[in-house]
Amino acid sequence: MGAVLAEVAERLHDNFPYFHPLYAGQMLKPPHPVARAAYALATWVNPNNHALDGGRASSALEKEAVALIATMFGWHTHLGHLTSSGTIANLEALWVAGKLHPGKTILASEMAHYTHERISGVLQLPFEKVPADAQGHMDMAALEARLAAGDVGTVVVTMGTTGFGAVDPLPAVLRLKEKYGFRLHADAAYGGYFGLATNLGPEAADAFVHLGEVDSIVIDPHKHGLQPYGCGCVLFDDPAVGALYRHDSPYTYFSSAELHLGEISLECSRAGASAVALWATMRLLPLWPGGEFAQGLEASRRAALAFAQRLGEDDRWEVLCEPELDIVCWAPKSKPELSQAIFDEAARMDLHLALIQVHGRLWLRSVLMKPEHEGWLEDILIRLDRAYVLAAARHF
């Protein structure tokens, strides 16, 4: 076994240093040590949270953990559970939406994650994109024009887009909901925890204040919740939607008169270890404004603001938009074709960035989701400067 594990360790060297602040590319945040330890501990039991028969302790911990997340959104009654990913969580939310509004169109911003269009196809529900403004927000005039045309069952707002970290104008969408009566789902997979931060801009802060007024929410603890990958969460404000899950099969579990997690989820087998890890993390780092967990989010936000400011003060760079959370997109101002070359040069200096295509132009992108990024900004900027100089010299 030792030889095999040594081989595994060697193979795992073929990775980017996701844990390090110089990895400033995609949405990868190291799990907290308590999450890793609790997850590893639970794997010795290997619980399956599909039913109480498969994971009594981990099922109880999941319910407690999900209730804490619901409370963060101001929900004291809810229906919800963990999932293996944000994609599955969104699938479940849109499945419920489709059951309540069969055949009706689902709308989401053109900047929303592509999974919504894909999921709608799987569910055989019509899907349409709503144009976004220059800041990446859903365009309210375009949304209302489409709503006025009728046949819309559900609108998806994104609380932190994958590309920009843009927060859709939820208060304005809620006003349209009162007028047109559609179901409202919030994809807060990335940004959901930022309601705890005290240093958001006024529009984003106001959107998070109203997040508890939607019908369903998806949040990914495996992004900003310090969890190992494989931990999403879906929440519904009305527990009555549980009736939509009713089924009978020879495999039905009869271990409790109370609805168990397998009876309110589309997924069957799910790792109970994810619930154990999440519960332990929130036990150590409660979801409190001003607490240690919230302070980590605020540090990431400060890092993004400072990074965008420094880039904006440099005549060589153009910042795509003011960051609303902790994602910054920028490009060479006079030489936009250099983005790929700068990306490559930065990687050679162990600064790992990401790329995003917006309106036919390639932009550099950084997700500054580690609190440590704030203390590493100078090092990041020095390497970025060198990458620019080398890229410009080699291509011109």
Predicted feature descriptions by range:
Residues 69-92:
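Short loop-beta-helix segment that forms the pyridoxal 5′-phosphate
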Residues 175, 180, 358-396:
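PLP-dependent enzyme catalytic core of the Aspartate aminotransferase-like
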Residues 46-53, 76-81, 127-130, 152-159, ...:
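Glycine- and acidic
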